[in-house]
Regions:
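Glycine-rich helix-loop "coupling/hinge" segments at transmembrane-helix boundaries
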Residues: 7, 105-131
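Generic alpha-helical transmembrane segments of integral inner-membrane proteins
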Residues: 41, 94, 98, 102, ...
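Membrane-embedded alpha-helical segments of multi-pass transporters/permeases
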Residues: 48, 109, 148-152
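C-terminal transmembrane helix and the adjacent membrane-cytosol boundary/short C-terminal tail
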Residues: 53-68, 135-163
Length: 163
């Protein structure tokens, strides 16, 4: 609910932007896709950061020192050492974010208004407002497929990596 007060036309963001002279008239941010993106990123960013941080904290720093000793520049070290070693944390964070965001309906409903279409919101609308249970069931199966297929590919890749 706080984001509504921040993003509305008379909200804190518009007042701040007008007071420092960046804009002349208030922006319409509420009931747009941008408002939904802001709300979702704000809500789910910790679910991405925590597994990534845990993975990076376990990383052996001597590998970064070895890359630097061998003449590797910091950016190349980042792409060739840090990113490959942090892939498990990146994948865990992606799954921790992807799964709940696919079913999200509160944030799109509050910040995006009626024009925002996300699969969780469509599912909620079809079940509870339109009472169109066949369409809602089809949407639920699509959502299930969208969630299960990446998890199956991840499991297959983990099984190949182990063997």
């Amino acid at each position: 609910y706080a984001w509504i007060g921040i993003l509305k036309t008379e909200g804190l963001l518009n007042l701040a932007l007008i007071s420092i002279g960046i804009i002349d008239k208030p922006l319409t941010i509420m009931n747009t896709d941008l408002a939904v993106y802001i709300g979702i990123v704000y809500s789910y960013l910790p679910f991405m950061i925590l597994p990534l941080y845990a993975n990076l904290e376990k990383m052996d720093m001597s590998l970064l020192e070895a890359a630097a000793d061998l003449g590797c520049r910091p950016l190349k070290t980042f792409w060739t050492v840090t990113i490959p070693l942090s892939l498990p944390g990146i994948l865990a964070g992606c799954f921790l974010v992807f799964i709940p965001v696919m079913g999200e309906f509160v944030i799109p409903d509050l910040l995006g208004g009626t024009n925002t279409l996300m699969i969780g919101k469509v599912l909620w609308t079809e079940f509870f407002y339109n009472r169109d249970w066949p369409v809602a069931s089809a949407v639920a199966i699509i959502l299930l497929a969208l969630l299960v297929v990446p998890i199956m590919f991840y499991q297959k890749s983990q099984e190949k990596a182990i063997s």
